[in-house]
A protein has these predicted regions:
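Histidine-acidic metal/acid-base catalytic patches
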Residues: 1-101
Length: 101
């Protein structure tokens, strides 16, 4: 899986995504955003469009590498999104998926 939260800062990301694509090894694509500043390295992911990650650029590289599967939204957010009403979160996820992914 290519999880933008774990790889967005890697200067060699484009090369490695292309390499993985040539080998047919991209099996999943996960999106969230990196909150600045972050409060927890694992459980403070931001909603797409609210952080530092250029998700559309990375998505373009992943698709250029041949991936055309599902995109999984992973908002692990104990301080924010997990505390909100589920319908509100789903509405925002859908809107942000259209505008920030």
């Amino acid at each position: 899986a290519i999880d933008v939260y774990h790889v967005w800062f890697d200067p060699g990301l484009d090369v490695q995504v292309a390499r993985a694509g040539m080998a047919g090894r991209i099996l999943a694509f996960h999106v969230s955003d990196w909150r600045v500043p972050t409060r927890d390295l694992l459980l403070d992911r931001a909603m797409m469009g609210d952080g530092a990650i250029d998700i559309p650029r990375i998505r373009g590289r992943v698709e250029d590498a041949g991936y055309d599967g599902l995109i999984e939204v992973e908002i692990f957010s104990q301080h924010d999104w997990w505390r909100r009403d589920a319908e509100e979160v789903l509405t925002i996820v859908a809107e942000r998926f259209r505008t920030a992914v």
